Amino acid sequence: MNDFTFPENKTLVNNQLRNFQYTNGKFQHTIIDPQKPKDNQINIGGTDYFFINLNNSGKSKGSNSIILKLYESQNFDLEDIEYGVPDKILKIFSIPKASKSYLKRSLEKRFEKEIYCLDKCKEKKYQNVITIYESGTCKIFDSRRRVNKEYLYYTMEYSESDLKQFIEENSSMDFKNKINLCLNISKGIKELKSIGFYHRDIKPDNIFIIGETWKIGDLGLISERDEDDEIDKENEFIGPRGWITPEAMNKFLCEGKQLEFNYDCKLDHQSDIFQLGKVFWYILQNNAPVGVFKHEDFQLKYNKLYPIVRTMLNYSKKRRYNDINEVIKLLEPIEKEIQLT
């Protein structure tokens, strides 16, 4: 564990890290000033870092997390302040530890499980899941209650772009790179499955490019195969809206109710395959399959791909692929064929 404490003039306001000062009997909050790096310094595992918000507005990606860029202070020129590529990303769970709320405690358990899964992937030296570095507890001053509170955190590698942003900026990506991208993501799902985890939140925003490799990140909704301690609540809406699976919608609408018919409400590896099919469609032709669709809706003229994606997107798990290995084995010959043309 690598615990640390934020500077005394930092606090959380609406899930955003802010400066604060006590003036005329009132606390005043201001956005962190990137031009004063010495005011924004922390030490993690014996290394000093300057930190800034992920974006200029201070808003973080993710409703339950604070995301900061970290820069090693020894490599930083204080005479010519310029923020380039960060050394790491810091992700902090925005709810204090030891909360008495059942909902907040459940969210904390999910963050702990995310860290556990990323640590397992790091141990295995997996290549298509985001790499974690340190994890532990950090202290941030609560300016309202005037006490330090503890928050879970972890650091990870920096990504230049997520899939959504990348496709919007590279809409003319060639077919070879699209297939390589689909394979990278599939291998990430395979890596998670090999250690007994399902992602359950596969969408373009949670897929990141590191160098030339695509990796899966944001494991906040992962589930462990055959787990005894079930975090999910009955009728909970699990997964990204717009990329939702049939069984996730069944869980939300039907679970635990005395209905005329029985529906599959279990989110598992085949649910990941369904979501991945939607992401493949988005990669291949830049939109998403919604409602009833046919072969003519698939605008790509390469005929070997549509049957693969269509099988992944079947409503019933019985008609989907059982394992992501089946998808990988179908994509690899296509990749080789393209390389020869």
Describe the predicted segments one by one:
Residues 146-162:
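Conserved short submotifs of the Hanks-type protein kinase catalytic core
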Residues 193-209:
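Catalytic-loop of the protein kinase fold
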Residues 181-182:
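Activation segment signature within eukaryotic-like protein kinase domains
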Residues 1-56:
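Juxta-kinase regulatory segment immediately upstream of eukaryotic protein kinase catalytic domains
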Residues 210-243:
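Activation segment/activation loop of eukaryotic-type protein kinase catalytic domains
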